[in-house]
Amino acid sequence: MKLKKIIGDVKYELICGDLNVEIDNLNYDSRKVNEKGLFFCIEGYTSDGHDFIDKAVEKGADVIVCTKVPKKLPNCTVVKVEDGRKAMAVMGANFYDNPSHKLKLIGITGTNGKTTSTYMMKSMLESSGYKVGLIGTIANYIGDKKIESHRTTPESLELQKLFSDMVHDKIDYCVMEVSSHSLYLDRVYGIVFEEGIFTNLTQDHLDFHKTFENYYKAKMILFKNSKRSIINIDDKYGERVFKDAGNDKITYGLTEKADLKAENLKMTSRGTEFDLCYRGLREHVKINIPGKYNVYNALGSVAACLNEGISIEKVKDGLNKLSSVPGRCEIVTHNTNLDFDVVLDYAHTPDGLEKVLKASREFTKGRLISVFGCGGDRDKTKRPIMGEIGSKLSDIAVITSDNPRSENPEEIIKDIVQGIKTDNYVIVENRKEAIKKAMLMAKKDDVIVLAGKGHENYQILGDKTIHFDEKEIVSEFIKELF
C-alpha cells in the first residue's frame, strides 16, 4: 500500500522522501521491521523510539514516522506528525482497510469484571448464531481459535491486525476489554463501539495514572466513542458516569434506581439464580459462576445483548452454557474425596479481593482461608489496604508473594502487613509453599481462596519469568498430600 493512502487524513509534514513509497509492514518495535517497512517512533516510559531510527532503517524501514525530526536524516522517507500514538492508530486502521467498521464492537471498562463479562457476552451472542471474537486479559479469540494475549488491550497495530483477521474469518461481533491504559495511550483511538459498558471503579493502576481523577477520566474516554452506554448505577461512580456519558444510556444493578435489575438472588458455590427485571419483563436466570459481583457482570452483559436485539431466551441459554471463566472465582475440580474447596481468582485489587472473599464466605460452611500477595513495581498504596481486607474477611490469611518483579518480596509483604490489625495471619514468602501451608491447614468444609494469579501460568521474580500454574500446583498437592 502507498504511504499516501496509509496516512489518509492524518496531519503531517513531509521532511524528506516520497509519499508514493510502497509499504507492506508497520511496526513500532525496530527489531520487527522488515523490508518495505514503516517505523513509528513512539515515546515510551522507559525508551524512546526516536533512538532506534538507525536500527529500523538497517532492518529495512523505508519510512520513519516521528514527532521529533532526527538531527541526521536517514536515507528514507521521514514524516513528522503531532501525536505519534494517534497517528499510529489511524494509520494502522487505514493499512488494514479499517476493519473495525466491518465489525460490531462491544467495549467494557472498569477496574474489575471485564474478563468475566466478555466471556458471558461471547456465549450469549454465539447462542444467537453469531460468530464472535474476543479480546482480553486471558486470551484473544477469533471464533473458537485461541490466540495468546500479552496485555488486556493490545497496542493499536496489533489490535487492527486482530480486527482484520476477524473480518477475514467472517466474525460478526467483537467483545473486548478496554483498559484504562489503552484509553489513555490511544490504543483504541478512532474506534467506535456499539455498546460501552462500565462495571465499577476502585483503586488500581495509580502507579500509572498518579491520581484517581486521572484514572476516572481515562475510563470515560470509552463512552465518548460508544453509541450507547451501559452503567452499573450501584457503583459509587455510577451516577457520575451516567451524568458524564452523553449518549443513550441504560443502567443496571440490584437497587430500585436501575433500569435492568436482579431480584430474589439465590447463591451457592456453583452459581446464582435470580429474577431479571427490565421494562416489564421478568425472567428467571441462572449463571454458573458464584458471587454477587458476578450477578453484576451478568446484568451488564445482558443489557448489551438485549440492546443488540438478542432474545431473552438466547440470553438465558448463553449464560447457562458458560460453565466457568478461567481464574475467575473458579473452583478447582478433582477426582478425590477432598473435603474442602480451593478457589482460584485473579483478584489483585482491594475491591477484587473484598468481592471474592465475600462471595466465597456465602458458600463456606467451615473456615475461609485466603492466600494472597501484591505485585511488585505497581501501586504500593493498595498493599496495606489489601492486608486489612484479607485479614478481616478471612479466618486465616496466608500472606505471600505475587509477582515481585524487581522488588524485594519481603518488603512487599511488610507493606501488606502494615494494614493488618488482627493476628489471624501467617507469612510464607514462597507462593508454592504458601499454597501447601493453606492446604495442610484446611479442614472439612473449609474454603481456600488463592487470590491474585487466577488464569496466569507464570510468576515474575526479578528479571525471570518462571512457569507457575496454580491449578497444576493444587492438583499436584492433592495427589501428594491427600
Swiss-Prot record:
Signal peptide: none
Stretches of the chain forming a coiled coil according to its record: none
Post-translational modifications reported in the UniProt record: Carboxylation is probably crucial for Mg(2+) binding and, consequently, for the gamma-phosphate positioning of ATP.
Keyword Transport part of the UniProt annotation: no
InterPro entries named among the record's database cross-references: Folylpolyglutamate_synth_CS, Mur-like_cat_sf, Mur_ligase_C, Mur_ligase_C_dom_sf, Mur_ligase_cen, Mur_ligase_N, MurE/MurF_N, UDP-N-AcMur-Glu-dNH2Pim_ligase
Compartmental location: Cytoplasm
Gene3D superfamilies: Mur ligase, C-terminal domain (3.90.190.20), Mur-like, catalytic domain (3.40.1190.10), MurE/MurF, N-terminal domain (3.40.1390.10)
Modified residues (N6-carboxylysine): 219
Binding site for ATP: 110-116
An annotated GO cellular component: cytoplasm
GO MF term list: ATP binding; magnesium ion binding; tetrahydrofolylpolyglutamate synthase activity; UDP-N-acetylmuramoylalanyl-D-glutamate-2,6-diaminopimelate ligase activity
Binding site for meso-2,6-diaminopimelate: 378, 402-405, 452, 456
Catalytic activity: UDP-N-acetyl-alpha-D-muramoyl-L-alanyl-D-glutamate + meso-2,6-diaminopimelate + ATP = UDP-N-acetyl-alpha-D-muramoyl-L-alanyl-gamma-D-glutamyl-meso-2,6-diaminopimelate + ADP + phosphate + H(+)
Keyword field: ATP-binding, Cell cycle, Cell division, Cell shape, Cell wall biogenesis/degradation, Cytoplasm, Ligase, Magnesium, Nucleotide-binding, Peptidoglycan synthesis
Swiss-Prot/TrEMBL cofactor(s): Mg(2+)
Annotated positions binding UDP-N-acetyl-alpha-D-muramoyl-L-alanyl-D-glutamate: 30, 152-153, 179, 187
Keyword hit for Cell wall biogenesis/degradation: yes
Motif (Meso-diaminopimelate recognition motif): 402-405
BP GO terms, sorted: cell division; cell wall organization; peptidoglycan biosynthetic process; regulation of cell shape
Record pathway: Cell wall biogenesis; peptidoglycan biosynthesis
Pfam families: Mur_ligase, Mur_ligase_C, Mur_ligase_M
EC number(s) stated in the UniProt entry for this protein: 6.3.2.13
Similarity annotation: Belongs to the MurCDEF family. MurE subfamily.
Described purpose of this protein according to its UniProt entry: Catalyzes the addition of meso-diaminopimelic acid to the nucleotide precursor UDP-N-acetylmuramoyl-L-alanyl-D-glutamate (UMAG) in the biosynthesis of bacterial cell-wall peptidoglycan.
Entry protein name: UDP-N-acetylmuramoyl-L-alanyl-D-glutamate--2,6-diaminopimelate ligase 1
Organism: Clostridium acetobutylicum (strain ATCC 824 / DSM 792 / JCM 1419 / IAM 19013 / LMG 5710 / NBRC 13948 / NRRL B-527 / VKM B-1787 / 2291 / W)
